[in-house]
Amino acid sequence: MVTETLSRKADYNANKLRKRLRRLVGTAIADFNMIEKGDRVMVCLSGGKDSYALLDILRNLQAHAPLDFELIAVNLDQKQPGFPEHVLPGYLSEINMPFRIVEQDTYSVVKRVIAEGKTTCSLCSRLRRGVLYRVATELGATKIALGHHRDDILETFFLNMFYGGKLKAMPPKLVSDDGCHVVIRPLAYCKEKDLAAYAWHAQFPIIPCNLCGSQPNLQRQVIKEMMQQWDKKYPGRLETMFTALQNIQLSHLADTSRYDFVGLKPHGIAIEEGDKAFDEEPLSVIPVDMDHDDDSTFEPENEHDGGAVQGGVI
């Protein structure tokens, strides 16, 4: 009886989580106009938890969305030692998903250029992007969908701030480096821990991300641990920080190339973004956009990222 009750509760929570993630993805798509009628969306699938979840949620939205669009999954086999070549074709065939496996030995290039024991992720990522842009052109894809989530975006923001001296994050939508494609990140509003729980419940055949033997990006790992500590000690802080990325006030920063500080003159008209001297901003005690539905998130018994630093994303 107890086992049956626990099972029902787990199913109930899993269903709530599934609905929430679909809602968040749908909202992100609408907010940034990520997918339009007639689009051919190339979903980059690495075999990590995030890209699996992305594909699964997009397939559900495709079945219920009021507009027609195509999906095609693409995996880049980089010839890393031990890569299970049969896993993704088997999974995609089983769910009747159109796909293409691209074989390109970028692994050898990376090993030749990067010294043993160093982090290879940056070069590997650049090579991978170049191949994927080419494949997108060959497939006639109008959008390239990547599986980066909210935590990836915040991590990138802090990496650029702490180590690069830039206020720069990872946009939910952008034009690709070659200027020919639109890249979208439909998971932009989704928490990593929710995606991990979603993948665990769905039992996706996760492929490890560390087959290349690369050392972890220590800077990113420091940022990730910092954010995890904040999330535990100050619930809602990450939500507030993400909201801040959507609420920029250039007049209260210090970039003269973005705001005309030099030409500022008094005009006698009060403006909302103007300097309020010592008047304190009315700040809410409750973090902005705090998701009160967290009870629907359940943690897997042995949470396995499957995508590690890169979020399991191509």
Swiss-Prot record:
> What are the names of the required cofactors?
Mg(2+); [4Fe-4S] cluster
Which top EC class applies here? transferase
One GO BP annotation of this record: tRNA thio-modification
Q: What is its main location?
A: cytoplasm
- Give a yes or no for keyword RNA-binding in this entry: yes
A single GO molecular function term of this UniProt record: ATP binding
TM annotation in the entry: none
> Which residues make up the binding site for [4Fe-4S] cluster?
C121, C124, C212
Which of UniProt's keywords are assigned here? 4Fe-4S, ATP-binding, Cytoplasm, Iron, Iron-sulfur, Magnesium, Metal-binding, Nucleotide-binding, RNA-binding, Transferase, tRNA processing, tRNA-binding
Q: Where in the cell is it found?
A: Cytoplasm
Q: Does the keyword rRNA-binding apply?
A: no
- Pfam families assigned to the protein according to its UniProt record, in alphabetical order: ATP_bind_3
Superkingdom of origin: Bacteria
SUPFAM superfamilies linked? Adenine nucleotide alpha hydrolases-like
User: What are its E.C. numbers?
Assistant: 2.8.1.-
Catalysed reaction(s)?
A: cytidine(32) in tRNA + S-sulfanyl-L-cysteinyl-[cysteine desulfurase] + AH2 + ATP = 2-thiocytidine(32) in tRNA + L-cysteinyl-[cysteine desulfurase] + A + AMP + diphosphate + H(+)
Q: Where does the motif PP-loop motif lie? A: 46-51
Q: In which pathway does it act?
A: tRNA modification
Q: Which InterPro entries match?
A: Rossmann-like_a/b/a_fold, TilS/TtcA_N, tRNA_Cyd_32_2_STrfase
Q: Which CDD domains match?
A: TtcA-like (cd24138)
Any one cellular-component term (Gene Ontology): cytoplasm
| General function of this protein | Catalyzes the ATP-dependent 2-thiolation of cytidine in position 32 of tRNA, to form 2-thiocytidine (s(2)C32). The sulfur atoms are provided by the cysteine/cysteine desulfurase (IscS) system.
User: What assembly does the database describe for this protein?
Assistant: Homodimer.
The miscellaneous annotation reads: The thiolation reaction likely consists of two steps: a first activation step by ATP to form an adenylated intermediate of the target base of tRNA, and a second nucleophilic substitution step of the sulfur (S) atom supplied by the hydrosulfide attached to the Fe-S cluster.
Identify this protein by name: tRNA-cytidine(32) 2-sulfurtransferase
- Source organism lineage? Bacteria, Pseudomonadati, Pseudomonadota, Betaproteobacteria, Nitrosomonadales
